A protein has these predicted regions:
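Structural signature of tandem-repeat unit edges
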Residues: 50-60, 70-85, 95-109, 119-133, ...
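Extracellular/surface-exposed low-complexity segments
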Residues: 363-382
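Surface-exposed receptor/substrate recognition regions of extracellular proteins
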Residues: 1-65
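Long, low-complexity, intrinsically disordered polar/charged segments
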Residues: 1-12, 342-367
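Register-specific detector for alpha-helical tandem repeat solenoids, activating on a conserved position
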Residues: 64, 88-89, 112-113, 136-137, ...
Length: 382
């Protein structure tokens, strides 16, 4: 056999390395640009059993990150998912994925982040999700999705961020959330105008659920008796005109920070006892708000900032002073409302004095006798 020249040996080595690289790619292993040939050996360990062609995943239970970052997306139909229980992050960050073939997900229990950040995805199949319990962030960041097929989520408990940032989603997916305890960020920044049904009877966390749903106009009646966290729930729902009487939580304290901030079309709100938590920015920027009925709460200065049309303030519980209380932003408060406020404040006799800021316009509406209500409880008025 003739001895090869140095040049021929080098060319053969290059050819062999290219063959190894192509074989790895054919087996579904990513070889990013700039990967050193010395790293190819380690890459061999990433090959799925049997490779992509004829891939035997019939006994696989976890498809965690299986097709993430566009991996294998052109061969999804060859993947046997019949025994899969964990589909979390399966297609995570597959920004080239536009559609998904029918998958057998009948045994799936977790679908968390399955399609997270699949920004080009336009359709999803009718998945069997009847055994699913975790749907957190399932479609988060799917900005091209306009509709979702009816999914069986009757056993789901975690729905946090399921449709978060689905900015093109225009129709209510009508999911069953009867067992859901965490619905936070559920419809964050979605594009539909109405929600026809939402079972919140088991929910404790509704924070950010409808944040920035700027087209949302109506909500269904909801049982929120177990909810304690309403942080930013309806913030920036700029077309929402009315919310049902939903704040009937039986706990000692509920969080209402920023709950209705910038709900610029909201006209009326009825809330039960808040407890010891302050109302930080709760109604800030609610420029059309006319009536507020609220139970016991703790004050902060920013609660009613920008509520220039507020007329009726109906406290049904005791107001506890903390730091400050300022309704000077609300020059249209009725005399009855102003008296209601002064009457509801907790008596500070024997303690340090505190200042209630009503504003000059509101102060001018009160008689000396009415102002005395606050003075007798160790408050000054400004």
């Amino acid at each position: 056999m003739a001895t090869k020249t140095l040049s021929e040996n080098i060319n053969q080595a290059i050819s062999d390395l290219n063959s190894v690289k192509q074989a790895l790619i054919d087996k579904g292993v990513e070889i990013p640009s700039g990967t050193k040939t010395s790293e190819y050996g380690a890459k061999i360990g990433e090959i799925q059993s049997g490779g992509v062609t004829g891939l035997d995943t019939s006994n696989e239970t976890s498809f965690y990150y299986f097709c993430s970052s566009n991996r294998l997306i052109d061969q999804i139909e060859k993947i046997n998912t019949s025994n899969g229980t964990d589909f979390s992050f399966m297609f995570y960050y597959s920004k080239l994925l536009t559609t998904v073939p029918q998958l057998n997900t009948s045994k799936g229990t977790t679908f968390a982040s399955m399609f997270y950040d699949c920004s080009a995805l336009t359709t999803v199949p009718q998945l069997n999700t009847s055994s699913g319990t975790n749907f957190g962030n399932m479609f988060r960041g799917c900005t091209s999705l306009t509709a979702i097929p009816q999914l069986d989520t009757s056993n789901g408990t975690m729905f946090s961020g399921m449709f978060r940032d689905c900015t093109s989603l225009k129709t209510d997916p009508k999911i069953n959330t009867s067992k859901g305890t965490d619905l936070s960020y559920l419809f964050y920044d979605c594009a539909f105008k109405t929600i026809e049904q939402l079972d919140t009877s088991s929910c404790t966390n509704l924070s950010y659920a409808f944040y920035s749903c700027s087209l949302l106009e109506t909500l269904p009646e909801m049982d929120l008796s177990k909810v304690t966290n309403y942080t930013d729930t309806f913030r920036s729902c700029s077309k929402l005109q009315k919310v049902p009487e939903i704040f009937n939580a039986k706990g000692t304290s509920i969080n209402l920070n920023n709950t209705f901030q910038s709900c610029s079309k909201l006209t009326e709100v009825k809330i039960g006892n808040v407890g010891t938590n302050p109302l930080n920015n709760t109604f800030r920027g609610c420029s059309e708000l006319v009536t507020v009925e609220i139970g016991s709460f703790t004050t902060v200065s920013s609660t009613f900032m920008g509520c220039s049309k507020l007329e009726n303030f109906i406290p049904t519980g005791e107001i506890t002073f903390s730091n400050s209380f300022d309704v000077s932003y609300c020059p249209n408060l009725t005399v009855e409302s102003l008296v209601n406020i002064l009457t509801a404040f907790k008596d500070r006799s024997g303690g340090s004095s505190a200042k209630i800021t009503l504003g000059s316009t509101n102060l001018a509406k009160l008689t000396a006798e009415q102002k005395q209500i606050a003075i007798d409880k160790n408050y000054t008025l400004a």
